[in-house]
């Protein structure tokens, strides 16, 4: 459902001539998340015993479904803060009776043309963040629990490089057939054999402010794992 919503938003923004504002995208994302919550609640009774694919690589249980529902609810609460303009309040404050009775209140009115701050623009990036969280949480490996702190920071950082990093780690967990404790052993073995002379130039491209927000060790491990996995595929 999240992937279909992402594709539909990208298509509507690329094909149509009209350029919608970010508030409309936020409202569409809220409706899509409500459908996701309904879909997950209806599937709780069906997958009561859990569903596992590829030896536990994709493992879905009621616990993971409840966790996804909780993330969707929090995301709806975050998006609804910036999805609706105080239009009624604005016009009430501009009414002549209101101006004559409370003239000082006009200074506190919010104009409709006030731009939103950059971290609150658009709901498309929030869908990518939710997709990262669902990919990481659905994996039964132990290493899929450690990057969860990135998901909470992505709402504040809101930068493309960290979203791509989360998608890369999620794709790595799905592309490699490693589960449970085997994943920790393989990632640690990759770290010991990785040539950091190749990773350091890529590592320097990240902004210094953004690097301080992340754990440097995890960033190096993620890059090393992705590069090593690409070498294994070739």
UniProtKB/Swiss-Prot annotation:
It is a multi-pass membrane protein. One of its GO terms (cellular component) is mitochondrial membrane. The keyword Protein biosynthesis does not apply. It is found in: Mitochondrion membrane. The keyword Transmembrane applies. The chain crosses the membrane at residues 28-48, 67-87, 123-143, 154-174. It comes from the Eukaryota. Its main location: mitochondrion. Belongs to the complex I subunit 2 family. Could be the product of a pseudogene. Product of a duplication of 2 fragments of the ndh-2 gene in the mitochondrial DNA. These 2 fragments, which are not contiguous in the ndh-2 gene, are connected to each other by a palindromic sequence of 37 bp and together they constitute an open reading frame. This is Putative uncharacterized mitochondrial protein NCU16001. It comes from Neurospora crassa (strain ATCC 24698 / 74-OR23-1A / CBS 708.71 / DSM 1257 / FGSC 987).
């Amino acid at each position: 459902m999240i992937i279909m919503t992402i594709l539909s938003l990208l298509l509507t923004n690329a094909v149509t001539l009209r350029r919608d504002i970010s508030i409309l995208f936020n409202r569409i994302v809220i409706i899509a998340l409500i459908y996701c919550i309904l879909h997950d609640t209806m599937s709780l009774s069906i997958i009561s015993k859990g569903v596992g694919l590829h030896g536990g690589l994709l493992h879905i249980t009621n616990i993971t479904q409840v966790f996804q529902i909780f993330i969707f609810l929090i995301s709806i609460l975050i998006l609804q803060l910036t999805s609706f303009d105080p239009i009624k309040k604005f016009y009430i404050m501009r009414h002549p009776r209101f101006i004559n009775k409370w003239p000082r209140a006009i200074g506190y009115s919010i104009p409709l043309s006030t731009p939103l701050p950059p971290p609150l623009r658009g709901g498309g990036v929030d869908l990518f963040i939710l997709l990262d969280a669902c990919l990481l949480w659905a994996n039964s490996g132990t290493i899929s629990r450690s990057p969860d702190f990135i998901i909470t920071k992505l709402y504040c950082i809101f930068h493309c490089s960290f979203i791509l990093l989360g998608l890369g780690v999620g794709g790595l967990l799905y592309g490699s057939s490693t589960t449970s404790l085997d994943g920790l052993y393989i990632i640690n073995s990759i770290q010991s054999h990785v040539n950091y002379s190749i990773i350091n130039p890529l590592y320097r491209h990240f902004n210094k402010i953004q690097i301080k927000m992340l754990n440097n060790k995890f960033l190096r491990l993620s890059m090393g794992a992705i590069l090593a996995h690409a070498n294994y595929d070739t």
